[in-house]
């Protein structure tokens, strides 16, 4: 299934058992590839996502309570209230405007507000890095301790430049609104360790539903093991990756040695 399948058969996917549960949560995609998709999550899924976010956040250098700046397009269906911003100790930074003045204001806020964690679109963080380099800004007065790119693949040279500028690790999350945080980039290379306890992953060939060979670029297909309100089974989310299986302590774990964005944005043979 894919997003179009969910949109066309939306009511049939919703679990009758969980449909009207008062503690459900509705997550919305940004709609960058079409109409936003509303995804219902049950209480246990929400709790599992929260626990996963805490664990993978700490692994990336972000801890609960840190001042966080989140750089993305803040459309109405994801915009946070003033209470939520206080509760989460967060600053919203809008990436829909990234001219020199906007970047200067962004850097000033990061420095003045003593932001400790930067989360944002990879492209927006790249533009901020480029602005710092061109303007000769001094990052030594900044308090940033962790940078977490999301949504797009960050080129390795940009990642290493950001690490040098702010003197902190830059490790991307692999995540989406439908499922949550699904993996964390390795510290020393571009690969990802993915959460195989919460999700079952398949890497299928680009032009068929046969499993891709190890080391072959393929489509990511996800089964969410915890969302009972809106079962996500064999979901082709449009992303592509090269996967390898590694043995550790008698168990084989799946790693993504290369991760790319939406298939519609790629050219391949």
Task: Tell where the protein language model's regions lie, with residue ranges.
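Short hydrophobic/aromatic segments of transmembrane alpha-helices and their interfaces
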Residues: 19-20, 29, 164, 225
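Conserved AMP-binding loop of ANL adenylate-forming enzymes
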Residues: 54-97
């Amino acid at each position: 299934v894919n997003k179009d399948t969910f949109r066309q058969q939306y009511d049939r996917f919703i679990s009758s058992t969980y449909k009207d549960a008062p503690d459900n949560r509705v997550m919305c995609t940004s709609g960058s590839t079409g109409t936003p998709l509303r995804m219902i999550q049950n209480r246990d899924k929400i709790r599992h996502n929260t626990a996963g976010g805490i664990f993978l956040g700490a692994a990336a250098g972000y801890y609960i309570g840190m001042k966080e700046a989140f750089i993305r397009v803040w459309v109405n269906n994801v915009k946070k209230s003033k209470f939520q911003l206080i509760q989460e100790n967060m600053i919203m930074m809008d990436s829909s405007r990234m001219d020199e003045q906007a970047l200067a204001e962004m850097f000033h806020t990061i420095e003045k507000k003593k932001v400790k964690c930067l989360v944002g679109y990879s492209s927006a963080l790249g533009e901020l890095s480029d602005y710092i380099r061109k303007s000769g800004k001094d990052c030594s007065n900044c308090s940033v301790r962790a940078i977490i790119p999301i949504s797009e693949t960050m080129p390795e040279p940009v990642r290493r430049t950001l690490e040098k500028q702010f003197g902190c690790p830059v490790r991307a999350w692999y995540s989406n609104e439908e499922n949550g945080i699904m993996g964390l980039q390795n510290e020393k290379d571009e690969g990802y360790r993915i959460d195989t306890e919460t999700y079952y992953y398949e890497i299928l060939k680009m032009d068929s539903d046969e499993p891709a060979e190890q080391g072959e670029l393929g489509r990511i297909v996800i089964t969410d093991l915890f969302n009972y309100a809106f079962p996500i089974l064999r979901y082709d989310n449009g992303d592509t990756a090269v996967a390898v299986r590694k043995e550790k302590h008698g168990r084989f774990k799946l790693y993504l040695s290369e991760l790319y964005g939406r298939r519609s944005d790629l050219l391949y043979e």
